[in-house]
Structure formats: C-alpha cells, structure tokens
Amino acid sequence: MAGSGGGIGAVLRDMGSSLGELLGGGKLGQAEEVSTGVLFGLLGALARADSIVTSHETGLVNGLLDELKLSTRGRELALTAFDRGRRNELNLADELDRLFTVHARGSEQAARLFDSLVRLAVADGRIRPREREFLNELTLRLGYDPGLLEDKLKRYGST
C-alpha cells in the first residue's frame, strides 16, 4: 500500500460508491458500526503489513472517509479502528467473526469489503510480500478460492 498512484481519486470514488451501502450511507446502526470498525481496522492492519504506515496511506484513508460521507461519530469510529489495526491491536479472524455477526460469509457486503481491501492494497501498483500474506489470509478466511485474489490483483494492475 506504500507509494503513490495517479488513479487514487477514481479508486476512492468507486470504493465510496461501493461501500456506501455496506456502511449505511453515513447512517450508523449496529450493522454499520460493525462494518465500519472491521473495514477501517483491516485497512489499518493492511497499511501496517509492510511495517511502515506512510502519510500516503493515511491520506487514502482520509480520502475514503470523505467519499463515504460518514457522520462525525462514524469518522471517529473509523479512525479509532484504523489506529487499532495500524498498531497491530486486532486479529484478522476475530474481526471477520465480528463482520459475520451482521453479514453472512459469502454475502455481497463481505465481497465488497474484500474488493475494497484489494483495491487499496494495489492502489500504488504493487504488492509487498507482507501485504500479499495479509491478503492471502483474508481471502482464505472469507472462504474464497485463492484464484479469486490473483484475478483481482491482475484486474486492478498489481505487479
């Protein structure tokens, strides 16, 4: 997730549109609070996967917050979750278990979360080895075939 890319704005707009429904379009009920916490926690963990959380990665998260038009409460929840992930204070399996309490494994919402994490990981055009490890584990824990991750990485332009 490190580095910079010219198409970041387009990626954020697409993700904001895709994730808006998952996160309640800015209105946070219980399911949306869980989804927001899981998404941003995993974004923090993904950013941390290559050992350094860059200002670019933080900028991506802030851009995504703007695109999602979260309420003040939603932004606070998202940033707290991102910081937990960034500080390595969460467990991938536990976070996904939380997600599965409000969205079924294999649901459209889980697919959107997966797609968004992959897109942000490749936003700079490359995947570092620890980011790939994170994405591989995420893929398996979501119940997807590893080939799906490879297809998405090719589609989104990872090298």
Regions found by a protein language model. Give the residues of each.
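Small-residue-enriched hydrophobic alpha-helices in membranes
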Residues: 1-45, 52-159
